[in-house]
């Protein structure tokens, strides 16, 4: 697994710690709300946690502040909308041996999931 080290002042680090302890923001748009339902009450919640929601899985990464990160997938990919969508659609294609289950969802549901995930900052 790769790691990136970010050097911050003590004050900036403390601000980051406080921010990371906050629950996920509430989705605002209908698309975000539909995505939240899929992520927090659907198959994603079996493995992933989103603090402040019903999603309390322990196997996969905590998604609460996903978009506060610059990389994901165990450090192999920059966190961009395109990379995350590709990961959600087929993680094994990006990272062979990925433990994320391959799920088949419609493009419409992918759009909903992505809209919600992008709110998790």
Which residue stretches match the model-derived regions?
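Flexible gly/pro/ser-rich segments immediately N-terminal to CXXCH heme-c attachment motifs
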Residues: 39-41, 76-79, 100-107
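Solvent-exposed, acidic/flexible segments
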Residues: 28, 32, 56, 77, ...
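Electrostatic cytochrome c docking/interface patches
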Residues: 11-40
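Extracellular/periplasmic metallocenter environments
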Residues: 1-15, 45-46, 51
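Short microdomains enriched in Cys/His and/or Lys/Arg
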Residues: 11-18, 66-76
